[in-house]
Regions:
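Short secondary-structure transition/capping segments
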Residues: 4, 411-415, 624-625
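Sec/Tat-exported extracytoplasmic proteins
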Residues: 106, 184, 335, 352-356, ...
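Beta-strand-rich, non-transmembrane domain signature
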Residues: 41-300, 370, 383-389, 393, ...
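A carboxyl-terminal module marker
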Residues: 522-683
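Extended, non-catalytic structural segments that build the interaction scaffolds
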Residues: 332-336, 481-483, 586-591, 611
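Secondary-structure boundary elements
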Residues: 303-376
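Bacterial Sec-dependent N-terminal signal peptides
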Residues: 1-45
Length: 683
């Protein structure tokens, strides 16, 4: 709620859900329209009235009757001071005012918070004018306890200063209220405002005033519609200093007010949701340009500028242009026997993947020099993949780093480049007409494969091409094929199970088998089997070949004793529960890949038994045919043939399609529970 994700933070870019965000420019675009677009309102008055006995009347609120706390209002106002530091520095001032009703002790954490956490320096924000009160209702009267210095604790950790606030006399039903002012030096940063947090908010409002000489891009994100979206222009005149220009600027200011009413709490993660960062309602800002009395400067970063910046950084691209002679001798051995550029690339990739330990820390920047990574054989994701890029270049291959945002980090807005949108580095190598994308940071990833987390939209090559690289989940289809054969034999009723997994499931299982044995894996499967089923001769196919899809198999034997057998033809692949069981969903369905699951079973009818009941065949599909489920079964006197297939052809389902996909999976769950009923033939 409010500024950033805490109370005081510098402007920071948080990833934007591309389908639910848009960018507008202020004030340059808005200055083209001189009339006021709408009159500013002050609808927050009912919420910001004094605390009275009526404030304590509700024991719950209709917005969320189970909420442990409710934000009664959260209001921020940003203004500018053109005369900071005797006119030589421009600054923005944020004034924040918030009132919270604490309904349950589980929300008492809101009464203790860090007021500020920053490193001292000329670019650090300053905080003042803090005021706080605790209100309680006692004997029918409102009792106010004002905070004083004894409620504010100052801590120092190195050069990091922190101020911790603890509200006194907090009890269930209390109201806490506080306000403060933050001054941000400079004109480049307007603080991000979040309208949504862990608790419901009755009113959240952001009111900013900026001079039209500054041109900001504004990015909106979220699903709620503004109840206030106002614009007011005013005449202004003040001294400014830009470069060689010093004088009086005459122009206008623009005031923007955005407000949301009855904002629900940010819900917990739901199945098939990337990250809540994609869905929180918020506004953030980025300076594009300054236009002042003939002084013009562009601040918006282009991909050309961002690439140039990254390639010059010591902890990213600077060493990629070096010859790195310390690699010479070792690489002769590593690439020995490679007869083509692709073979050389495969040998390099395999060596880095198999000989370097990654701590799985994600980020754009190296934690150490490439030479130290080479010597220590360990590092973070950027260390290892930038080393891979450097080695490829050393060997004459056309290699470049690629930056992307992982699914857990959130969506990046590709047409508005900001480094904060990206948190992962991979390597791209161009061989003729083919581009190979490589990630050597994980031992279970094959050549030319990327982990599931990388498929999250556009990635960018950091080289002279500035190439967009599409890594959308819709582009990946995870295919799984399972075949089961059950036969009457001289040794009894036996069968074989074979399953070929797709790329991502193969990665998951290989990673799992780094922590447990093959026997442990199959023992966990055995525990899910019926008591009349035994397993032996189990194993994996291509376990130690990460490039290959991983298969597994086992042999089984049945000992039927009962007169009636309820036999489910789907062994391990059925949905035991609907992944979309919630009657109401708050965020779109975001699957990591498309699905093509095929399951085939051919079984002899066990000797001495007959088919008493067979499920009916069925075929259903979603309205747009993006999801299809087939369940086909038939039997004759001796054999049962069964085939089921689930196909999902798209990965993102908006909220208005949720009920349909929920019903679709409910049908699948119910259908896959239906057994084949076999009865013993009476003599």
């Amino acid at each position: 709620m409010g500024v950033g994700y805490g109370f005081f933070q510098y402007f920071q870019v948080v990833n934007i859900l591309s389908m639910k965000c848009y960018v507008v420019l202020i004030p340059v675009l808005l200055c083209c329209c001189c009339p006021i677009l709408s009159s500013a309102q002050d609808p927050s008055d009912p919420y910001m009235a004094d605390v009275t006995t009526q404030t304590f009347a509700p024991t719950a609120y209709s917005i969320d009757s189970s909420a442990a706390a409710v934000i009664l209002f959260d209001v921020g106002a940003v203004s500018f001071n053109p005369n900071a530091n005797n006119g030589h520095q421009f600054s923005y001032i944020l004034e924040k005012h918030i009132r919270i009703r604490l309904l349950n002790k589980s929300a008492f954490n809101l009464a203790t918070f860090t007021l500020s956490a920053y490193r001292k320096g000329p670019a650090s924000p300053t905080i003042d004018n803090f005021k706080g009160e605790t209100y309680n209702l006692e004997d029918g009267k409102v009792v106010t306890i004002r905070l004083d210095k004894s409620n504010i604790f100052k801590d120092q950790s190195g050069d990091l200063s922190m101020e911790r606030v603890v509200f006194p006399n907090v009890k269930e039903g209390s109201v806490i209220e506080y306000s403060f002012r933050v001054t941000y030096p400079g004109f480049q940063y307007i603080p991000t405002w979040t309208f949504q947090g862990s608790y419901p908010e009755l009113w959240s409002e952001y009111d900013i005033t900026v001079p039209t000489l500054y041109d900001y891009a504004v990015r909106h994100q979220g699903y709620q519609k503004y109840v206030v979206d106002s614009v007011i222009y005013s005449d202004a005149m003040f001294p400014i200093n830009f470069g060689n220009f010093s004088g009086t600027w005459t122009g206008r200011t623009i005031r923007r007010i955005w407000a949301l009413k009855d904002v629900p709490a940010l819900e917990k993660m739901e199945p098939y949701t990337t990250t809540l960062r994609n869905h929180i309602s918020k506004i953030d800002f980025q300076l594009k340009a300054v236009h002042a009395n003939g002084y013009d400067r562009t601040y918006r970063t282009t991909w050309n500028e961002l690439t140039d910046e990254l390639l010059k950084r010591d902890n990213f691209g600077a060493s990629l242009g070096d010859r790195n002679r310390w690699l010479d001798d070792d690489l002769k051995t590593i690439t020995m026997g490679a007869g083509s550029p692709r073979q050389r690339l495969q040998k390099i990739f395999t060596y880095v993947r198999d000989h370097f330990d990654c701590n799985n820390v994600e980020g754009l920047y190296m934690s150490q020099s490439l030479k130290k990574v080479w010597e220590d054989k360990k590092g973070n994701v950027a260390d290892i993949n930038l080393l891979l890029t450097a080695i490829c270049r050393h060997e004459g291959l056309d290699a470049s780093p690629v930056i992307l945002s992982t699914r857990q980090h959130g969506y990046a807005v590709d047409d508005y480049p900001l480094l904060g949108d990206y948190n992962y580095v991979i390597t791209r190598v161009q061989l003729g007409d083919s581009a190979w994308l490589l990630d050597a940071s994980k031992p279970y990833i094959g050549f030319g494969q990327l982990p599931e987390l990388c498929y999250n939209g556009w990635a960018r090559a950091i080289d002279s091409s500035f190439a967009q690289i599409p890594l959308f989940p819709d582009s990946m289809t995870e295919t799984r094929l399972t075949t089961v054969e059950l036969n009457n034999t001289d040794s009894g009723y036996t069968g074989t199970y074979n399953r070929d997994n797709g790329i991502f499931e193969s990665m998951t299982i290989r990673n799992r088998l780094r922590k447990e044995t093959v026997d442990d894996f199959f023992e966990s499967l055995r525990k899910t089997m019926a008591d009349y089923k035994q397993m032996d001769q189990y194993g994996f196919d291509s376990l130690n070949v990460p490039e290959a899809d991983l298969g597994w198999h086992y042999r089984m034997k049945y000992n039927f004793r009962n007169g009636t057998i309820y036999f489910n033809p789907i062994f391990h692949e059925r949905f035991n529960a609907n992944p979309f069981n919630a009657p109401v969903r708050h965020y779109p369905v975001e699957m990591p890949f498309c699905i093509n699951n095929i399951y085939v079973l051919n079984m002899d009818i066990p000797r001495g038994y007959r088919v008493d009941q067979l499920p009916q065949s069925q075929r259903v599909k979603l309205e747009d045919s993006s999801g299809i489920f087939e369940y086909l079964i038939s039997a004759d006197d001796s054999v049962i043939h069964f085939r089921t297939q689930l196909t999902i052809r798209k990965t993102n389902y908006p909220l208005d399609e949720y009920q349909e996909i929920r019903d679709f999976f409910s049908l699948i769950v119910a259908k896959e529970k239906e057994p084949i009923v076999l009865k013993k033939i009476k003599p």
